[in-house]
A protein has these predicted regions:
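Short beta-strand and adjacent turn/loop elements
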Residues: 23-139
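Bacterial Sec-dependent N-terminal signal peptides
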Residues: 1-23
């Protein structure tokens, strides 16, 4: 009986060495997608704790921008951002692409917050984005 148990245990040892996880793909595509909040308005969640400080203390107020201006800038900046993401450039800063539809009416609050994300990345990481206005870009 001891020999049978020993034989079964020896037979099972190789199976315990196999990985239980499925291997990840070389390049996973993560995208930030806008979502609607409880009020039905588009909202953007930024997880960086310094972003709220930046928005309240450093960023220009929302009254300085028009919605059409922000939409135009965001369209260009999202394309530039996604180009960097897809090429693997600035991988330590840009960890996901952005799913943004310029035909969608997101509202000025969303457009403002998205634009300020680009200004914030420029401010914090000194990442040069060509679509930023001269007064918003850190040189």
């Amino acid at each position: 009986m001891k020999n049978i148990i020993l034989l079964v245990m020896i037979a099972l040892v190789p199976f315990s060495c196999f990985s239980q996880e499925t291997p990840k793909k070389d390049k996973e595509h993560h995208e930030m997608k806008p979502s609607k909040n409880e009020d039905g308005e588009w909202d953007l969640t930024v997880i960086d704790t310094q972003f709220d400080y930046f928005l309240n203390a450093v960023a220009k107020p929302i009254s300085q921008y028009s919605e059409s201006y922000l939409k135009t800038k965001n369209t260009f900046l999202v394309n530039e951002w996604n180009s960097y993401y897809n090429s693997g450039r600035y991988r330590n800063i840009i960890e996901s692409g952005i799913d943004y539809d310029p035909k969608e009416n997101y509202g000025i609050k969303f457009e403002y917050k998205l634009y300020q994300v680009f200004v914030y990345v420029n401010w914090k990481y000194k990442l040069r984005l060509n679509g930023l206005s001269g007064s918003d870009a850190i040189r």
